[in-house]
Each structure stands twice: as C-alpha cells, then as structure tokens.
Amino acid sequence: MVTVREEMRKGPWTEQEDLQLVCTVRLFGDRRWDFVAKVSGLNRTGKSCRLRWVNYLHPGLKHGRMSPKEEHLIIELHARWGNRWSRIARRLPGRTDNEIKNYWRTHMRKKAQERRGDMSPSSSSSSLVYQSCLLDTVPIISMDGGDIHDDRSCMARVLKSTQSVMDGYTMDQIWKEIEAPGAPSLLGIDEGKDKACSNLPCPLLTSTMSDYSCPEVFWKIDNEETRMLATQSGYGK
C-alpha cells in the first residue's frame, strides 16, 4: 500500500494555526521543532513552526514601534558590529533579529530620502553662490570678441592715418627729417597720431593694452639705428 505524502502548507499563518502552535509548544517545549510540527497537526515544516514562534508568538516579544532608547541602541550597535542582527538582538530583549533588520532598513531608507531632500535646495543654492563668486572675481579686462575687434580697428585706423600723412614725401625728405637734430615731429606724424587716437574709440583696457593701441615705438626711432639703416640703403652717403 502506497501512502501519499501530503504537501506542506506555505504562506501566511492563520489565527487557528497560531493557537495550535502555542498550545503544542506549551506542552512539549520549544526545542524539537520537527516533533512539534508533527504532533501539532499543522501541515507545516519544523522550520516554519520555529520561525513563527521566535518572530511572532513568543510571549517575551515586544510588539509595536521601537522606543527612542531602542533606536539609539540599534544605531550604536550597528556602527560597532555591522549587520550582525542576531548579536544585536541579544542586547535588545523582546526584539528579534528580523525585526531589528527591518527597522534598520526602514531607518536608512528614510534617512537617505531626507538627505536627498536636504541636498536638493542646498546644491542649487551652492550653484548660485558659486556663480556669484565667479561674477565677483571676473577680471576688469574683458577679452570678448567685441573688445578685440575694437582694438584691432583702432590700430588699423592709426596706421591708415600715419600712411596718409607720409604720402607725398620722398625717402630723402623722410630721412632728413629723422636725422635733423632738434627737428619737430616727423612731418606731423605725432600730431596726426595723437589726433587719430583722440578721435577713435580705442578701448582702454589696461596700461599695457593702451600702450599697444598707440605704441610710441612706432613713432620714435633711435638715431644710431637710423644712421645704420641709411648707410645700408645708400641714403646716408
């Protein structure tokens, strides 16, 4: 004769099953769980009966929310021992390792959400502060395209004005004017240059840039270098 083994029940426990298990444990104790499961008439495994008793039905268990003292102790012990829930549970009478683990996960999830909520406005605020600092520390010199264009335009106009003043004069006249001691400015070039610069919207960025816009080096030539150039060119003979 072949006996058909009945399939073990799984899933949530009913109130009737809880009462049966409590009565059986009171009679036979909470040690031999395979035997308890068999004599109780419950279609449950010994492991299932043990977990139900330890986590829910034991008379020494506490139910409900964790007290502030328990919460503080859990955080302190977790910092010391990590995820060793059974060891932590021994320091909290009436609380199971599974209950403590669930509390910790809920606590950490809530803490992470609060951290994200706090960081959201602060990050945007930090961004605004950073942008403000950038604006405060921007150099006075602006090197955008408009300024560079104006500076080049100024140089071009000055050179064009100089060229127009020099037109109509021979090289002999130019060299004589350069070599003449105590002579006035070369054919009015300085005057033309100053007039051109005064009428042009040259951007005065810095002293260096303003020197570059109307450089004196274009208008003053060392007499010794002039003589050397004249000798090489044949005009100083």
UniProtKB/Swiss-Prot annotation:
Residues 33-57, 85-108 bind DNA. A motif (Bipartite nuclear localization signal 1) lies at residues 62-65. One of its GO terms (molecular function) is sequence-specific DNA binding. Its main location: nucleus. The keyword Nucleus applies. GO terms for biological process: regulation of DNA-templated transcription. InterPro entries: EOBI/EOBII-like_plant, Homeodomain-like_sf, Myb_dom, SANT/Myb. A motif (Bipartite nuclear localization signal 2) lies at residues 109-117. One of its GO terms (cellular component) is nucleus. Keywords: DNA-binding, Nucleus, Repeat, Transcription, Transcription regulation. Residues 5-57, 58-112 form the HTH myb-type domain. It comes from the Eukaryota. It is found in: Nucleus. SUPFAM superfamilies: Homeodomain-like. Pfam families: Myb_DNA-binding. Transcription factor. This is Myb-related protein MYBAS1. The lineage of its organism: Eukaryota, Viridiplantae, Streptophyta, Embryophyta, Tracheophyta.
